[in-house]
Amino acid sequence: PRAVDRTQYALASGFAEILSTQLAIHELEVQKELTARAEVRALQAQINPHFLFNTLNTIASFTRTDPLRARELLREFSSFYRATLDNSGSLIPVSREVAQTKRYLTFEKARFGEDRVLATFDVSEDIEDTLVPAFVIQPIVENAVRHGMGDGDALRIDVSVHRDGEDAILIAVADNGVGMDEGTAARLFDERSARPDANSPQGGGAGVAMHNISERIHRFYGPHSYTRVESAPGKGTKVLLHLDLSESIFDIQE
């Protein structure tokens, strides 16, 4: 009987150890997701008053020259910030992130001129409902507008989102702007280069947002995911985001 008791005790102890390990792993995963959601909420809370002023000033100028256009912009502006606040989860469908990026461009086109900022979006239909972190495309497009626009030709921005193999997606944002040297491109996602910017919709600025994108992608999607910048002075810039969905810390349901 004692041998049986010892065997039962050993089995129970082993089971308890396994259960404790599983609970610890689960708790770690929960904490990772809570951290991810907190980071998104922090971005949402950073609504910059200067961007608010500049956009409302643009709308006000249209009230004198084109009241109908002013009304449309005001309605779109309301939708933009409502969507920003509504994206309370860490993950949103690709289609929603693209829609929010288009709203952002609406204000930049109104500010600089419809013929000065041109954009195309090429998104595979089969991944429109794929869940991605909020604020991964719009800040990159914002950075292209801020730093890519020159004094001559219109700025063209091409956004594409496609599958990259069976379990990954590739987000590409390319522009024909002024470009940047190798050192500047290497620092684009660097924490040390993240500086507040008064013209950014998110108060931390595009630099902070760009660094945040890189941090979240590597943290959420593992070592096989990456952020890459291809650029040269006078040759435009392309930003690539590779998201390995198979290594996501989230339980993604498509």
For the regions a protein language model found, what residue spans apply to each?
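C-terminal end segment of the histidine kinase catalytic
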Residues: 229-254
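Two-component histidine phosphotransfer core
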Residues: 1-47, 51-228, 238, 242
